[in-house]
């Protein structure tokens, strides 16, 4: 194939020109071509012949252009998942042999053109259009001549009307004019369908503003809380007195409510004993003769209830001082060494603290409740800390004694 010869590829979207030495009679229509917009424009023919034959060739080219457009739409708008139909091979459009113009008289322009138009609808993929340049912007729905199931009607390529076989120029020109108007209508419909697919900008803006309004409405404070503040009247003296009495009663009730949970905490897990002193004592657990001042227990419960292990540590420190912890063992047993004078901690006190901590943590949903093996470990940690504190205290005391032992030199007067 020479460089000047260009044929149409099966998969490409472009149409290629064919050199003029291509000897097929059907495709040799050099006087018809398309511009960029797909409009048919007439060029000067290479050879001078009958004018009616030239119009027939133009009609043939326009028919191929329209059939190619509709066929392309039908192939691209197939259902998803279905294999698109292949383009059939181009069929030869050969006009029937000319008859004598004197054999039939030319009919009127309008009826003849309408009759021919009904018999020459655009076909679906019958002619792929060698002479048309496909416009990439032309993508629309099938032409209204399609049937209900989406397929275009197929019409025989040969024209059945006698008027098409004759050489009446007025009829042929009318057919060509209607084909051109058909092309324009298809382009207008393509632009309309593209505009329908894109929503207008005003609609998008209105939807966005509606969404923003909904979000603002959610953030607004309900008006019920604002109404009593805005509607207020100046109360009289009697109303003020009534309000003061009601406020005092409410404050007393609130104070009772605040004190009752604290008392319930202690009463539920400890027994309060009446004593002549102002500060009553609380028995931590039943069956254990372990008592603690109520004020001290309340302060521990209000400050150290983040975890059960921390509460247990603070209660142990409240019952045992550093010297007792430093000279004790956590499990209550005596060390067997010769010079080891450590004794076990009082298991009565440790047991009461343990029972109180378990009940309090389970009732108030306190996290980090010590496990069965954690109690002894916590006691060992407290013993080590007490020893460190005593050691630091002894070192500080020794340093203070050394400073006191250094006497200032006497001054001679």
Curated annotation (Swiss-Prot):
Compositional bias segments (type: Low complexity): 223-232
Compositionally skewed regions (Polar residues) per UniProt: 99-111, 121-153
Any one GO CC term of the record: extracellular exosome
Residue ranges of domain BEN in the record: 287-392
Statement: the UniProt record of this protein carries the keyword Nucleus: no
Pfam families linked: BEN (PF10523)
Keywords for this protein: Isopeptide bond, Phosphoprotein, Ubl conjugation
Modification sites for Phosphothreonine: 324
Domain of life: Eukaryota
Amino acid composition bias (Basic and acidic residues), ranges on this chain: 78-88
PTM-bearing positions, type Phosphoserine: 328
PROSITE patterns, alphabetized: BEN
Record protein name field: BEN domain-containing protein 7
Origin species: Homo sapiens (Human)
Gene responsible for this protein: BEND7
């Amino acid at each position: 194939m020479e460089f000047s010869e260009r044929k149409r590829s099966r998969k490409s979207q472009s149409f290629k020109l064919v050199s003029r030495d291509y000897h097929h009679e059907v495709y040799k229509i050099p006087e018809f071509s398309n511009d960029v917009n797909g409009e048919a424009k007439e060029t000067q023919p290479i050879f001078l012949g009958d004018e009616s034959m030239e119009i027939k060739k133009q009609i043939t080219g326009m028919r191929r252009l329209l059939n190619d457009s509709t066929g392309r739409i039908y192939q691209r708008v197939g259902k998803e998942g279905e294999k698109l139909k292949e383009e059939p091979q181009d069929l030869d459009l050969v006009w029937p042999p000319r008859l004598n113009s004197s054999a039939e008289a030319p009919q009127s322009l309008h009826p003849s053109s309408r009759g021919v138009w009904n018999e020459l609808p655009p076909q679906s993929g019958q002619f792929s259009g060698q002479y048309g340049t496909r416009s990439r912007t032309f993508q629309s729905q099938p032409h209204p001549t399609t049937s209900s199931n989406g397929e275009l009607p197929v019409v025989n390529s040969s024209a059945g009307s006698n008027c098409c076989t004759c050489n009446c120029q007025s009829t042929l020109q009318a057919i060509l004019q209607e084909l051109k108007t058909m092309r324009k209508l298809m382009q207008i419909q393509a632009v309309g369908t593209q505009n329908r697919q894109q929503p207008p900008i005003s609609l998008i803006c209105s939807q966005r503003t509606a969404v923003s309004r909904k979000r603002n409405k959610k953030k607004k404070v309900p008006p019920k809380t604002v109404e009593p503040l805005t509607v207020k009247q100046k109360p009289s003296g009697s109303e003020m007195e009534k309000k003061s009495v009601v406020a005092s009663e409410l404050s007393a009730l609130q104070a009772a409510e605040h004190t009752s949970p604290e008392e319930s905490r202690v009463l539920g897990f400890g027994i309060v004993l009446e004593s002549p002193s102002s500060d009553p004592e609380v028995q931590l657990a039943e069956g254990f003769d372990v008592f603690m001042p109520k004020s001290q227990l309340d302060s521990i419960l209000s400050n150290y209830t983040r975890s059960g292990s921390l509460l247990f540590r603070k209660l142990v420190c409240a019952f045992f001082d550093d010297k007792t912890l430093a000279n004790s063992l956590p499990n209550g047993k005596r060390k067997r060494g010769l010079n080891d004078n450590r004794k076990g901690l009082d298991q009565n006190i440790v047991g009461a603290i343990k029972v109180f901590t378990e009940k309090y943590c389970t009732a108030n949903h306190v996290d980090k409740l010590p496990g069965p093996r954690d109690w002894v470990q916590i006691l060992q940690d407290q013993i080590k800390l007490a020893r460190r504190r005593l050691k630091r205290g002894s070192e500080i005391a020794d340093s203070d004694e050394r400073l006191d032992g250094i006497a200032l030199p006497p001054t001679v007067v």
